[in-house]
Regions:
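Membrane engagement elements in two modes
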Residues: 2-7, 17-75, 83, 99, ...
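Classic N-terminal secretory signal peptides
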Residues: 11-14
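Surface-exposed coil/turn segments at beta-strand junctions on protein surfaces, enriched
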Residues: 69, 85, 117-119
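Hydrophobic core residues within well-ordered beta-strands of beta-rich domains
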Residues: 74-76, 90, 122
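Intrinsically disordered, glycine/charged-rich N-terminal periplasmic/extracytoplasmic linker segments
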Residues: 79, 86-87, 105
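Short acidic, flexible loop segments centered on an aromatic residue
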Residues: 86-100
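Short, solvent-exposed, Trp/other aromatic-anchored flexible loops in extracytoplasmic proteins
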Residues: 102-137
């Protein structure tokens, strides 16, 4: 049986796509109890060698029932280690929820240019902008770590 040039290109493209997805690793997504101004030890790994080490939230001061916008940002500092033997990029997303399950604030980030080298750790600062006025009511957070090619 003769394989056409088009067929060979399609097979090569599919094989490359599957290989890339396998090399990327799997999405790691878990929910935890929220605590402000405390370094939370997470220590969860995805199969590709990226480990979510710690999360620390920094909330600005409150005035009454709202966050004070002057002089402060709502930030999550997320430490990620690369325990593998190849440089890796990562995408991060984090969401805050109250005890009723309402979504209070979201932030995302990750590598823009340089990957995390093997056996190294990088700390990402994720800023919660837009909807975040009731973030101080958070009782839980969900964080997702997605390996990138």
């Amino acid at each position: 049986m003769r394989l056409s040039l088009f067929g060979a290109i399609v097979i090569l493209a599919l094989a490359t796509g599957l290989e890339t997805r396998a090399a990327q690793g799997e999405l790691l997504s878990k929910r935890y109890d929220f605590k402000d101004s405390v370094v939370l030890e997470v220590s969860e790994s995805e199969p590709g060698g990226l480990r979510l080490d710690t999360v620390q939230f920094q909330l600005p001061a409150r005035t009454g029932d709202r966050l004070t916008r002057v002089g402060g940002l709502l930030i999550a500092r997320v430490a990620v280690s690369n325990t593998g033997n190849e440089a890796r990029k990562v995408g991060l997303a984090i969401a805050l929820f109250d005890d009723e399950g309402r979504l209070l604030a979201v932030a995302s980030g990750g590598n823009k240019l340089t990957a995390i080298k093997p056996e190294r750790q990088k700390t990402f600062s994720l800023v919660f902008d837009g909807v975040n006025a009731e973030a101080h009511k958070a009782t839980a957070f969900q964080i997702s770590l997605e390996p990138k090619p």
